[in-house]
Amino acid sequence: MQVQFSKMHGLGNDFVVIDNVTQNVFFSKEKISQLADRNFGIGFDQLLVVEPPYDPEQDFHYRIFNSDGSEVSQCGNGARCFARFVKMKGLTNRNKIVVSTKAGRIVLYHERDGQITVNMGEPIFEPAKIPLKANKQENIYIIRENDHTFFCGAVSMGNPHCVLLVDDVETADVEGIGKTLVAHERFPEGANIGFMQILNSGHIKLRVYERGVGETLACGSGACAAVAVGQMQKKLNKEVTVDLPGGTLKIRWQGPGSILKMTGTAEHVFDGNITL
């Protein structure tokens, strides 16, 4: 069986995108892991699957699988690639696209300059909904592991995020601390670990260690999480430029009770076929 796919990326965070509207494909966890291998497969951070809508008021359903085959609820960079893919492949001609995800409903917008804006919904800070084991909601949590103490913010952007403030993202121990915290017992479902350096109140640098993936060149939901946490800690403005290793995103959030929006690029690399 031949399955068509597209290779895409958002700021270097790379994806294989599958049209499961005109095709009917199932990938096992093991098969996803094989295809994600950069030496023996196609190579990607995540597999994105476009499915028919579950609700007639929505345009599509959006599924995301990490390179280890685990299914996750949200991916901001992937959402931008999803939006470009469905229009590029003629699955829709709309500039506003409503999709459902495992985490809920999101809205995607094609901008006139070719960039894509994603309505990421409201950041969720309630510990039980992140989920995070904590007695009460705080702007800064103390997490201990062995002889180390970490001060971090926590938020869900449809997936759990832990954000640490660092002096310099270039010298931060992203690999070591990331591995320590990504599956910490305080996060029952694991968490993506963000390392944020504040340049000024409207500009940050960020690196993210993602659960099930490791460090990537960019993490859209991680950028959203960092800005939301920074605002709650009274350190950031309502509009923030986020520099990631793979490029730049613009994040806008008016504060608690309002939706957060992310704007950035989505690039098509090539199309191919998988033999199953």
Curated annotation (Swiss-Prot):
It catalyses: (2S,6S)-2,6-diaminopimelate = meso-2,6-diaminopimelate. The active site is at 75 (proton donor), 219 (proton acceptor). Homodimer. The record marks 270 as: Important for dimerization. The keyword Cytoplasm applies. Its EC number is 5.1.1.7. InterPro entries: DAP_epimerase_AS (IPR018510), DAP_epimerase_DapF (IPR001653). This is Diaminopimelate epimerase. Keywords: Amino-acid biosynthesis, Cytoplasm, Isomerase, Lysine biosynthesis. Catalyzes the stereoinversion of LL-2,6-diaminopimelate (L,L-DAP) to meso-diaminopimelate (meso-DAP), a precursor of L-lysine and an essential component of the bacterial peptidoglycan. It is found in: Cytoplasm. GO terms for molecular function: diaminopimelate epimerase activity. GO terms for biological process: lysine biosynthetic process via diaminopimelate. GO terms for cellular component: cytosol. HAMAP family: DAP_epimerase. Belongs to the diaminopimelate epimerase family. Substrate binds at residues 13, 46, 66, 76-77, 159, 192, 210-211, 220-221. The record marks 161, 210 as: Could be important to modulate the pK values of the two catalytic cysteine residues. Pathway: Amino-acid biosynthesis; L-lysine biosynthesis via DAP pathway; DL-2,6-diaminopimelate from LL-2,6-diaminopimelate: step 1/1. PANTHER family: DIAMINOPIMELATE EPIMERASE, DIAMINOPIMELATE EPIMERASE, CHLOROPLASTIC. It is an enzyme of class 5 (isomerase).
